[in-house]
Amino acid sequence: MDEREVYVPQTGNTQAKTALLRRQLNLRDTFFMSFGGQSPLLSILTYGAAVLAFMGYLSPVALALGTLLVLLNGFVVQRLSNRFTSTGGYYTYAFNALSQRVGLQTGWMYMFYSVLYGCAYVAGSAFLLNYVLGLPVLLGAVLVLVPSSTLVLLGVKPSSKYAVVAGVFELLVILSVFLGTVYLAHFHFYNPGSYVGGANTSKLALGILLGASIPTGYGSVAPVSGEVVDAEKVVGRVMILVIVVGGGLAALLVYGFMNLSVVSGTPFLTEGGAPIVHFFSHYFGYAATLLLIFAAINDGVLATVAFTTASSRTLFQMGADRVLPHRLSSLRNGKPLNAMLTVVIAYFAVSLLVLVRLQAFTAFVALGIASALASLFIHIAANASLFRLSLKRVTRRVSVGLSDLTSTLGEIPLAFVATAFSALDLVYSVLSAVPIYVYIFFAWIIAGYIYADAKEILGESDQNTHGEGRNE
């Protein structure tokens, strides 16, 4: 029999009760869905190229620091996922731990993050297909969007099966390429620290932001918690494992390319928007490059599947709680079809419109930076959620006794440090990013506040109208 739960938000509105989705994802499925959301190989060829442009030979350091930032936030979200196992992820955490209004704003920003982050991978895939094979950019985007949308509409289980097969293949490709760079470098290794003086350290915050965009793909798993078997244990473990594996592999592979560049004396930091592809082709040949591109495009499909699924589950729960139109929470054959169709349309619209207006790599960078800023925003909200919950638990436990207090006390500095690190990188990234990306980011925040205010005013108006009717 299908396992179902009832999620009751803290609004006291009994009409908001809703049956959640069937739990059918095990640990392996969840890991590879989240790993697919990271898309390490495509991330290395796209986000990695952007980090290289900013940081040069310090790129592995920026990637490692980006992974550390994501890991801090990941530990916070892990603790929250142990407490909240229903659908919705970051939105659900803020909705229950902080307030309905903050939850709405967090869900609003998560939609911005997840749609733009997924569309960035569509743009990255389109760029690589155009760069290597000469395919028109819009055709390349459609080649990613159509199969990914089909998988999403088929359901989370078929998507997870595809993610497992594709993820194993990708792991083998990444490890093989790294070992190949080590072999070609004759097992010599360079020290990134010796290049600090020649690096553009003023762009370090932006380099960390882009570096963090690779492992931050783990954020696709939290919204699907309601479909994970034994979510209280599985989701948190998967988050940390995916961050370490995905971020570690990305830093390792970029280091391998940089190491080969240093040892061989062959620079590749000026090769347009695809230095890694160019360098790979130079050393491994065109046939191997085609294999790399195939794996990267497969990554684009994986990332789009993971984040389209995550976006639709967030919309589904927001509709169920009536902070967005309730129709978004309707189920058909056990799937949130309205939410899924809404997100699929958004992916097609954003990807194609941006690629019509901008060059593919520029579109990727724009979408990537804007989504990364939003990622920091929602993680600050998650950190605040854990901070408040931990303070409340400490207060309760001190009043009744000190048993099991140590782990809760440890959550407070964890949330504080993660918030400080995220806020610092957010501020410095805003100051160093291209202004138009920042304007779009803040415009979406303002739009969310306007929507929340309008909803609140209309809600009060409805209450007053009903009250007057009863008085009559």
Give a label for each model feature.
Residues 91-97, 121-141, 227-231, 239-245, ...:
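Helix-loop-helix connectors at the membrane interface of multi-pass transporters/channels
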Residues 177, 184, 370-378, 403-472:
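A generic transmembrane alpha-helix motif of multi-pass inner-membrane proteins
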Residues 1-58, 70-71, 75, 87, ...:
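Membrane-interface "cap" regions at the ends of multi-pass membrane proteins
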Residues 43-133, 242-245, 251, 436-448:
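Extracellular loop-to-transmembrane helix junctions
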Residues 109-123, 220-227, 286-325, 368-369, ...:
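Membrane-helix boundary/coupling elements in multi-pass transport proteins
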Residues 92-95, 99, 241-305, 324-371:
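TM-loop-TM module centered on a large, flexible mid-protein loop between adjacent transmembrane helices
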Residues 126, 137-187, 198-201, 216, ...:
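Membrane-interface loop-to-helix entry segments
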Residues 16, 21, 60, 134, ...:
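Helix-loop-helix junctions that connect adjacent transmembrane segments
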